[in-house]
Amino acid sequence: MIADQIRKMAAGERIPVWGISPVSKMADELPGHRPDDLLPGTRSLICFGVPVPRAVYQMPAYGPDTIWRSQNLNYRLLDTLAIRFAALLEENGASAAPVFGCMPLGVNQKGVVVGYLNQIRMGEVTGIGVIGKNGLLINSRFGSRLMLGAVLTTAELPEMRYPETSESGCPSGCRICVDACPVNAILPDQKKVKIMHCLGYTARTPLMSKSRFLFLKAFNPQTAARYMNLKAFDEHTFHICSKCVALCPYGG
């Protein structure tokens, strides 16, 4: 059974949280960003997460540098695992495609930088967490520190998750992330982030000209996205702010 092989691989790779859900749970995503747009005939979603260690976000010295390196190494791990899960599914006769953790990105019709699929939403529908006021996936064990990888497949897999969890979500009165955000990018009632406000403040991309990116985005969003993916991939983007993750009291 393919599900047993997925479970075995997840255990062997020490993936602490993962889940599987039917694709119908993401039927309300925007056109162009639905699972079927990437892999026609998708029936099942697989999403999994690995955390950045808590202490990385608490380091008084070299904190941003250590966060930067930790996140980049986790992205490589997650992307590699997504490819391996996809290969496992194809060995069993299904089609499967990885959904990478960060890059490549696109620019949608509103001029907003977005992933090809909403991985945070995938994490929620597969049951490994809920979306918090900071717009991130929060988990009762790892808080906001989970980084995500995912796979789409035409295999019809049983819905499951590991471990079984019941998430209460953010306390109603908590505004720690909202008040800490230096550019007021967090919309707690909508559980969303004004991503261009956030990136405009935190992202440092020494190899990418922001003025050129904005020019391309105005006239050819697809070219702008390709330029960004080539110039700001992996280590080529440095974030100076992670307060919405570091200060989140939810979970561990």
What is each model feature region?
Residues 29, 74-252:
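Catalytic cores of enzyme domains
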Residues 1-78:
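Non-catalytic, usually N-terminal nucleic-acid engagement modules in DNA/RNA processing proteins
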